[in-house]
């Protein structure tokens, strides 16, 4: 693989305060600790300047070791990177937010994050990593959100993170946080792809100067088996997507990423494969025609690969209806 530098041609999106976030980043969900460090090293060499992390992924310490090595070697400077992480659902209590953030900073070897997100609008008992029964889940309420959000605002005041935001928030829940926020959310990271286009959410977010980040932009075919459903549609083999790829002379994955960026959404595909890392980065240079965008618009089927049903076990306060605020 020939390394190439993409820093000067990377697309950026402006945030409400004038700072800019790289339009394409490296997702690290499902990247095991044994391989994530090498993937991050290769990504930085290729010109990636945006990493999307989370405490629950269990690999932040290895990412931190890779970052430290890159800083020492002069591959990249901290101020050239955009690094996001996420607050897990067992640390929503106001007293738990700063310790959780400080643990992430320690693992990543950083003094600050560029962006810190509430990972899910779901609350777990403090001593539980991932719930195995419904009684380990607590209700997500306006009062609980307000306490969490005020602690995140304090983290910004302390300089521990530059921006705060949310993930997996519906339009209704975005309105909820906006109604109580001194510092409004900069980003809402949600599942976004041609089968789940979320146009209403995108329109609302744009109206509030909130940027959407698209996770699972390629359909997340490699997610854990427990998260997969029988006979689910495969984005990467969709005939419309592949027809456009043939016209453009690129891969189906590149069409999906170019589509996301062209809609004004950040996208964070995960890969540990050097060739795919490079292909994904090149997608930022692809421009789809109006006709191609119109064809993709017709593919929306409101299909979630990450349905959230793992929060809805018996005895849980969560249903798919109140999680996504859909009828």
From Swiss-Prot:
Optimum pH is 5 for the reduction of methylglyoxal. Coiled coil: none annotated. GO terms for molecular function: aldo-keto reductase (NADPH) activity; aldose reductase (NADPH) activity; carbonyl reductase (NADPH) activity; NADPH binding. InterPro entries: AKR, AKR3G, Aldo/ket_reductase_CS, NADP_OxRdtase_dom, NADP_OxRdtase_dom_sf. Keywords: NADP, Oxidoreductase. Its EC number is 1.1.1.184. It is an enzyme of class 1 (oxidoreductase). Optimum temperature is 60 degrees Celsius for the reduction of methylglyoxal. CDD domains: AKR_AKR3G1. The record marks 86 as: Lowers pKa of active site Tyr. The keyword NADP applies. Curcumin non-competitively inhibits the enzyme with respect to furfural. To a lesser extent, enzyme activity is also inhibited by indomethacin, coumarate, coumarin, and alrestatin. The active site is at residue 57. It catalyses: a secondary alcohol + NADP(+) = a ketone + NADPH + H(+). The keyword Oxidoreductase applies. Substrate binds at residue 119. GO terms for cellular component: cytosol. NADP(+) binds at residues 18-27, 216-280. Disulfide bonds: none annotated. PANTHER family: ALDO/KETO REDUCTASE. Belongs to the aldo/keto reductase family. Monomer. This is Aldo/keto reductase slr0942. It comes from Synechocystis sp. (strain ATCC 27184 / PCC 6803 / Kazusa).
